[in-house]
Every structure is written in C-alpha cells, then in structure tokens.
C-alpha cells in the first residue's frame, strides 16, 4: 500500500473535472486543492494556527532552501519537518531541481548530477537524484518529488528530448534511492516543454515506473496561458485516473479554474504570498493594488464578499497605511486575505463539481473578476 492514495468521489458531468480525496500519513484533503508554499519551513508571516483557520490542508516545503539552511541533518534530529515547524497536516517537498535551474546561473548538468554555485555565497554544490532523496527522507514530508531537469521555455526540441530522457533515468534512480516508501510517497514529474509528443513520451515513461502520484512540471514559467492549458489538456490523458495529479507552480485564479476543468487535483504557487508583500490583493472583483492613492480614505474591506480575518476587521485605508509604512502587520493581513481567497475559490470549485456546474461557475467568476474584457488585470 503506497503512503499516499487517491480516492475518486465524482466527475463533473458538465466539465469533466474531478472531485477526490488524497489520503496521506498526516491526514486527508479534498481535491482540487491549492497548497500554500512554505519555502523555508514557514508560509511567510503566517503561523500554523492561522493556516488552519483559513483551512489550508497541505503546505509545501522547499528542499533546496532547507538543505542549505538550516540543513536537513538538523531537521532530521527533531524527527522531520512536521515537528520542526509544528505543522501536523500533510507536507509536500519539491526536489530542489527547480531552484537549481532557476536561481543558479552557474550550473553544469551531467548524467550524474547538477553542479552549481550557492545562490548567496558562491560555494560549489552538487545535487543528484540520490542526494535529493536523502534530503527529502530526512525532512520526512508526506509527498516527495523526483529530481528532474527543468528546461527553460522555449528550448530547442533536441535539448528537451534529451532532457526528458535524462529526467526518466533520474526518476528511476530516485525510486531506487528512496528509503521510506512506506510513509513517504514519491511523485514523478512529467516534463516536455511545449512539445506535445515529448509530454506524451515523458508521461508514458514515468507511468511505466509506477509512482503513487504524478506532477506536470515545466509550465507556468512565462509561456502564454493558452499554451499551458493546451499542454495540460494533452498531458492529462496519459496520467492514471487512480492517482493524484499535481500541476506545479500555478496559482492565478483563472488558471486554477481552467486546470481543474482539465482534470488536475493539486496546485501550488508563491503568487498569493509574494504579491501580498507589495500590497497586491486578489478580490472577487479582480486585482486590487492597495498602494493606489484612491484607497487612502477608503474604509471598506479589501473585498466585501470575503469573510477572512482581514476583511472582517480592517479597512483598505488602514492596510494601505501599513503597507506604505512598511509595517509587517500589513503584509500579514494581505497574506491572510490572499491565501483565504484562493482556498475559498478551491472550495467553490469543489462545490461546483459536486453540483455538475463548473463551467457555469467559471463563467460567473470570470465575469465578476473582470476577465472577460480585453487586456484584463490579471496575474
């Protein structure tokens, strides 16, 4: 029995989206689900108690950052990430691959590993499939990700083909090096850039290795959204129905709806927390930039349709003042709101699937959010 399993509840008759439950050693969560990102063992400015209050069910930790600071050996001493950060729900850790490929300019890819320089002190480091598994086994996450290569978009066909074949070989090495399959589930990551045949090849090769779950990687890296939707739609048909499907790095409201419609179950992104730090808020009427002068004496909540802690207690004028004054409390309030907004959106998506009306919900949401106009204010 794998450490993580997927239970299918129903398929939306109108859209084909799926409602399910993912069961993990630290509890279960309904899908489709958005997962807040806690890069360095904290969702920035939020306590675990606050995450529970906004109904976050599963959070992410970042293997690359936790390996470099404080070190996986320290986290292992206390029994893993759950104890270290006092979060008793499910945790997913990424493999570190994306950071190596995005943060480090100086890198050398060989069959054995990736050689790169530390993004702050320039020290030479190596990350391999085996090392990634060792770190993630020490972190003790419920879901671990295979170490993959993330080719930039766009890349030449030949380069991407070589890359996905290496990713498959690395995936096999990850499976062999993974020491705790009974209480940690290792997911494979499908790559292939914007080439449909390579996405298909990558999916088929990884499905043959029989991981307990699968992710689509290498999207939401700057390509136009229609390209991303096309790649998801094409790839999902090669992913097993009886295992979780995770779309990495997606967190804009429109993409969460569109990719739920296309059959994905799990999503993560730093977007809601990152934009909160400069005062950009997601609301039911679209994007709101709280620093704008027009909010200086606006005493309404960020979103009159929202019942989060921020919207129930504080005004736009007050939050604008805090953000302009660079007060940490302002960032806490916008972070709470943005994460609550996305988690509530996912709840609404799940309810619409239950009622077989996700396409209707999409139309209503897009209309109110202001996405049906030319050049909408989006993320």
Curated annotation (Swiss-Prot):
Active-site residues, record numbering mapped to chain: 94 (proton acceptor), 268 (nucleophile)
GO cellular component: cytosol
Annotated Zn(2+) binding sites: 306, 308, 311, 337
Enzyme class (EC, first level): transferase
GO terms for MF: metal ion binding; tRNA-guanosine(34) queuine transglycosylase activity
This protein's pathway: tRNA modification; tRNA-queuosine biosynthesis
Domain of life: Bacteria
Pfam family, one: TGT
Signal peptide (UniProt feature, chain positions): none
Function: Catalyzes the base-exchange of a guanine (G) residue with the queuine precursor 7-aminomethyl-7-deazaguanine (PreQ1) at position 34 (anticodon wobble position) in tRNAs with GU(N) anticodons (tRNA-Asp, -Asn, -His and -Tyr). Catalysis occurs through a double-displacement mechanism. The nucleophile active site attacks the C1' of nucleotide 34 to detach the guanine base from the RNA, forming a covalent enzyme-RNA intermediate. The proton acceptor active site deprotonates the incoming PreQ1, allowing a nucleophilic attack on the C1' of the ribose to form the product.
Protein name (Swiss-Prot/TrEMBL): Queuine tRNA-ribosyltransferase
Organism of provenance: Staphylococcus haemolyticus (strain JCSC1435)
Gene that produces this protein: tgt
């Amino acid at each position: 029995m794998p450490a993580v399993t997927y239970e299918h509840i129903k398929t939306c008759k109108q859209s084909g989206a799926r409602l399910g439950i993912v069961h993990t050693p630290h509890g279960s969560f309904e899908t489709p689900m958005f997962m807040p990102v806690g890069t360095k063992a904290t969702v920035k400015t939020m306590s675990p108690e606050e995450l529970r209050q906004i109904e976050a069910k599963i959070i992410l930790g970042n293997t690359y950052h936790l390996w470099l600071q404080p070190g996986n050996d320290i986290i292992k001493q206390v029994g893993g990430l759950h104890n270290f950060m006092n979060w008793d729900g499910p945790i997913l850790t990424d493999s570190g691959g994306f950071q190596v490929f995005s943060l480090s300019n100086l890198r050398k890819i060989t069959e054995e590993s990736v050689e790169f320089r530390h993004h702050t002190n320039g020290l030479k480091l190596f990350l391999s499939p085996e090392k990634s598994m060792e770190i993630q086994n020490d972190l003790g996450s419920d879901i671990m990700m295979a170490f993959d290569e993330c080719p930039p978009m766009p890349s030449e066909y030949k380069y991407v083909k070589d890359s996905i074949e290496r990713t498959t070989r690395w995936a096999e090495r990850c499976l062999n090096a993974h020491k705790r399959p009974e209480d940690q589930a290792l997911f494979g990551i499908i790559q292939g850039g914007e080439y449909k045949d390579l996405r298909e090849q990558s999916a088929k090769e990884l499905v043959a290795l029989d991981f307990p779950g699968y992710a689509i990687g290498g999207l939401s890296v700057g390509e136009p959204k229609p390209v991303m939707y096309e790649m998801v739609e094409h790839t999902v048909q090669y992913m097993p129905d009886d295992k979780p499907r995770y779309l990495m790095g997606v967190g804009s409201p429109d993409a969460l709806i569109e990719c739920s419609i296309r059959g994905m179950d799990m999503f993560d992104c730093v977007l809601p927390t990152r934009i909160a730090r400069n005062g950009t808020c997601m609301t039911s009427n679209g994007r709101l930039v709280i620093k704008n002068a027009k909010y200086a004496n606006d005493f309404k909540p960020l979103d009159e349709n929202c019942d989060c802690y921020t919207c129930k207690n504080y005004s736009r004028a007050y939050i604008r003042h805090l953000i302009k004054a660079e007060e940490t409390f302002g960032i806490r309030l916008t972070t709470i709101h943005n994460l609550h907004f996305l988690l509530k959106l996912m709840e609404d998506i799940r309810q619409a699937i239950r009622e077989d009306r996700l396409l209707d919900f999409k139309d209503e949401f897009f209309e109110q959010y202001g996405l049906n106009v030319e050049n909408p204010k989006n993320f």
